[in-house]
Amino acid sequence: MAADEPKNLSFVLEGIKKVKFEDRPVPVLKDAHDVLVNVRYTGICGSDVHYWDHGSIGPFVLTEPMVLGHESSGVVTEIGPAVKSLKVGDRVALEPGICCRRCEPCKSGKYNLCVDMVFAATPPYDGTLAKYYVLPEDFCYKLPSAMDLKDGALMEPLGVAVHITRQAEVKPGDTVVVFGAGPVGLLCCAASRAFGAIKIISVDIQPERLDFAKKYAATGVFLPEKASAVENAERLRSGHGLGRGADVVIDASGAEQSVHTGIYVARPGGTYVQGGMGRDEISFPIMAACTKELNMKGSFRYNSGDYKLALELVGSGRLSVKELVTKVVAFTDAEQAFEEVKAGKGIKTLIAGVDG
């Protein structure tokens, strides 16, 4: 490396829509179990765009410069002396949330609820849109030979979708309705199919997204009309032969109207899982939820076993993520890529690593 070449070029958010490329020190291993990863691909997530566009998400507020990105894959370039599961040169998917391992949620396996979570690109912690990133070996997952590094960058959103689908307890023979045909919603459709669902209906307000969903993993699609949630739910049930309703409803949109329609379209005794986040507070059809005695759950990120299952599904060929990647851009084009994702272009955009 020439003396004037950047050692750890990073894509840094300084304020709302104010970003820069900054050469930062190469991170050092802080623990004997740490590994240093040369990041090769990073997907742009809606949360990254929200921080860039608004400077905050709920209680997480940008107060100092932060490296963006958390959906990444890469190649191990250095390992700590206690690392046993990885070696230099291994291709890995990065799980970007490091838990404390000591609190009750961590010890119960629900480490996504860790009280001291350090999550990449969630203020104040830096993300993975840099040449190098350090994390513990057990949060790096070696990619099976059947998977490439682009697939690896999709393991983070797939982990989210796997967790949602496991929360919903989708089983063989189930009918599933998924609201939202963005990357996570589409992956919920794919995971539901892998888990044995026989009917999977994708719901979205963008026809082109529904066209993609039908080709990808959904058995049917539904475009809501400008009508009440009750009316759209009835159209959805009757139009797709759902009888009294779907066994499982997943909302991956966070839109209030989708939440309402989802509650109404679920069958009595069915399951409703909220995976999408929208406004902090919305109105809610509590009468319908109670009188149907719905099993209602929230879903947040991923926890024990979700990443491993995501890799197994893709590595074994039971689920494919390649179709979701609609564009790959150079690291130096990251800001333009954020603009395009905000405009709704494509399904999943990847930013190549600093080395290309």
UniProtKB/Swiss-Prot annotation:
Top EC class, one word: oxidoreductase
User: Reaction catalysed by this chain?
Assistant: xylitol + NAD(+) = D-xylulose + NADH + H(+)
Which cofactors are named for this entry? Answer: Zn(2+)
Q: For this protein, what does the record note about how its cofactor is bound?
A: Binds 1 zinc ion per subunit.
Q: In which pathway does it act?
A: Carbohydrate degradation; L-arabinose degradation via L-arabinitol; D-xylulose 5-phosphate from L-arabinose (fungal route): step 4/5
Q: Where does Zn(2+) bind?
A: C45, H70, E71
One BP annotation, GO:
sorbitol catabolic process
InterPro entries noted in UniProt: ADH-like_C, ADH-like_N, ADH_Zn_CS, GroES-like_sf, NAD(P)-bd_dom_sf, PKS_ER, SDH-like
KW Metal-binding (keyword) present: yes
Q: What are the protein's GO molecular function terms?
A: D-xylulose reductase activity; L-iditol 2-dehydrogenase (NAD+) activity; zinc ion binding
PROSITE patterns given for it?
A: ADH_ZINC (PS00059)
What EC number(s) does its UniProt record assign?
A: 1.1.1.9
Q: Which positions bind NAD(+)?
A: G180, A181, G182, P183, V184, G185
SUPFAM superfamilies found in the cross-reference section: GroES-like, NAD(P)-binding Rossmann-fold domains
Pfam families, A to Z: ADH_N (PF08240), ADH_zinc_N (PF00107)
UniProt keyword terms in alphabetical order: Carbohydrate metabolism, Metal-binding, NAD, Oxidoreductase, Xylose metabolism, Zinc
As for what it does, the entry says:
Xylitol dehydrogenase which catalyzes the conversion of xylitol to D-xylulose. Xylose is a major component of hemicelluloses such as xylan. Most fungi utilize D-xylose via three enzymatic reactions, xylose reductase (XR), xylitol dehydrogenase (XDH), and xylulokinase, to form xylulose 5-phosphate, which enters pentose phosphate pathway.
The entry sums up its family as follows: Belongs to the zinc-containing alcohol dehydrogenase family.
Q: Which PANTHER family match?
A: SORBITOL DEHYDROGENASE
Entry protein name: Probable D-xylulose reductase A
